[in-house]
Curated annotation (Swiss-Prot):
Class of enzymatic activity (EC top level): translocase
Protein name, UniProt field: ATP synthase subunit alpha
SUPFAM superfamilies registered for this protein in UniProt: C-terminal domain of alpha and beta subunits of F1 ATP synthase, N-terminal domain of alpha and beta subunits of F1 ATP synthase, P-loop containing nucleoside triphosphate hydrolases
Source organism per UniProt: Leptospira borgpetersenii serovar Hardjo-bovis (strain JB197)
The protein's assembly and partners: F-type ATPases have 2 components, CF(1) - the catalytic core - and CF(0) - the membrane proton channel. CF(1) has five subunits: alpha(3), beta(3), gamma(1), delta(1), epsilon(1). CF(0) has three main subunits: a(1), b(2) and c(9-12). The alpha and beta chains form an alternating ring which encloses part of the gamma chain. CF(1) is attached to CF(0) by a central stalk formed by the gamma and epsilon chains, while a peripheral stalk is formed by the delta and b chains.
């Protein structure tokens, strides 16, 4: 067999031409110990705090503690797959998540990876998970309502676009329901919603997603889920991820956004676990010293941007779970002091059938009537005061003393307001319907209706008005005020008489 030298030389020449010196220089370290989502790594002398690092099996972590001889790394993924002796290399990047309209209608984990089995998310952009909050010059005062569709809240504890309103109460008092009703009520308003579930049961998240889908709310919502089965680092990072996803719509698309953090108590517990495993010194209730900053840097990212920056907004509804109504515990007081008001839900009100179980006495909105349309200001101004007086009188009336007619009338009016404010779950009311009902009860057009029939009458009233006087609702919707109170009064009197004749 003859060797063709010219062929061999041509192949060799081609190989020499194509030869590239590919020398990658990575700064690497070695895993000393791993457990509970925390790795101690030797080496990585130049790693920066908060920098992402990559383990040899492709799992990512973040450098948290920089010590003399080692680096404390939190692992974002399955830490059981990492072994002692694995190499770890720097990436020179910070943690970023995919953002953009591709995420709408999807369920993702805090790293932006899909959990709903609908295939990959081909997002074109990413955003850092930790972004600086907008400064004073970038903001404008909150003045546009964020309607929740819940009568008790829209009338007495109004929420504005760009506000941070805490929902606080014991477990099982309907905190999540209020937040989800608010998301459902944004249908058709162009508001983008992000629901962040932290440390919840996977079954609960699944039923929440199903409910949003059935109500047609999933198409404008992103669900970020870090269930109780996920490692603590993922639960800790979840709210920041959700916030970054919403910030894209606020800054880039100039839209109004709503983010629900459900709930921040579990995030604080996850952060406490991480901090103790990293051997950071514990403080009150064993939380680390920077647990206030944990929540303040998250909630300060909510804002109503100035017109120069596109006038987008990010409204935050953080949820905190209390133990036995203890609002003065460490985390609740921290978050109360950061937010612009709180909606306090009481278990005894919930148990007695007053749902939503909002305690109007200690719930406040520090934005106040700036976040209400004029029609709501016209009718709801007196209601909070009347309800507070009713609660005082109610305690007094239980003593069984004889009451003068004026006090009795006030008690009856209060009872009617309480009945009118009751509302079934996931059935938010448009603001014009709320205005009509509240006008009817506060101006005395329900005084002849027996208290047990007030809710039934409320349904009857709205049905009649939609059928026969839809122009009344249309006028309130367009003008945002009640222009003809006399006419509305006549309509309500006629409907009340018709109801009393029939029932």
């Amino acid at each position: 067999m003859k060797i063709k030298t010219d062929e061999i030389t041509s192949v060799l020449k081609q190989e020499i031409l194509n030869y590239k010196k590919d020398l990658g220089v990575d700064e690497v370290g070695t895993v000393l110990e791993i457990g509970d989502g925390i790795a101690r790594v030797y080496g990585l002398k130049n790693v920066m705090s908060g920098e992402m690092v990559e383990f040899q099996n492709g799992i990512f972590g973040q450098a948290f503690n920089l010590e003399d001889n080692s680096v404390g790394v939190v692992v974002y993924g399955d830490y059981l797959a990492i072994q002692e002796g694995f190499t770890v290399k720097r990436t020179s990047r910070i943690l970023e998540v995919p953002v953009g309209p591709e995420l709408l209608g999807r369920v993702v984990n805090p790293l932006g990876e899909p959990l709903d089995g609908k295939g990959p998310i081909n997002a074109k952009l990413t955003r850092p998970v930790e972004s600086p909050a907008p400064g004073i010059a970038m903001r404008q005062p909150v003045g546009e309502p964020m309607q929740t569709g819940i009568k008790a809240i829209d009338a007495m504890i109004p929420i504005g676009r760009g506000q941070r309103e805490l929902i606080i109460g014991d477990r099982g008092t309907g905190k999540t329901s209020i937040a989800l009703d608010t998301i459902i009520n944004q249908k058709g308003t162009g508001v983008i919603c992000v629901y962040v579930a932290i440390g919840q049961k996977a079954s609960t998240v699944a039923s929440t997603v199903e409910m949003l889908r059935n109500k047609g709310a999933l198409e404008y919502t992103i669900v970020v889920s870090a269930t109780a089965a996920e490692p603590a680092p993922l639960q800790y990072i979840a709210p920041y991820s959700g916030c970054s996803m919403a910030e894209y719509f606020m800054y880039n698309e100039k839209k109004a956004t709503l983010v629900v953090y459900d709930d921040l108590s579990k995030q604080a517990v996850a952060y406490r676990q991480m901090s103790l495993l990293l051997r950071r010194p514990p403080g009150r209730e064993a939380y680390p010293g920077d647990v206030f900053y944990l929540h303040s840097r998250l909630l300060e990212r909510a804002a109503k941007l100035d017109d120069k920056y596109g006038a987008g907004s990010l409204t935050a509804l953080p949820i905190i779970e209390t133990q036995e109504g203890e609002v003065s515990a460490y985390i609740p007081t921290n978050v109360i002091s950061i937010t612009d008001g709180q909606i306090y839900l009481q278990s005894n009100l919930f148990a007695s059938g007053n749902r939503p179980a909002v305690d109007v006495g200690i719930s406040v909105s520090r934005v106040g009537s700036a976040a209400q349309i004029k029609a709501m200001k016209q009718v709801a101004g007196k209601m909070k005061l009347e309800l507070a007086q009713f609660r005082d009188l109610e305690a007094f009336a239980q003593l069984g003393t004889e009451l003068d007619p004026a006090t009795q009338a006030q008690l009856d009016r209060g009872n009617r307001i309480v009945q009118m404010l009751k509302q079934p779950v996931s059935s938010p009311f448009p603001v014009e319907e709320q205005v009509v009902e509240i006008f009817a009860v506060t101006r005395g057009f329900m005084d002849k209706i027996p208290v047990p029939k007030v809710q039934q009458y409320g349904k009857f009233l709205l049905t009649r008005i939609k059928e026969q006087h839809s122009e009344v609702l249309e006028a309130i919707r367009k003008e945002k005020k009640i222009s003809d109170e006399e006419k509305l009064g006549e309509v309500l009197s006629a409907i009340a008489e018709e109801f009393l004749r029939k029932h």
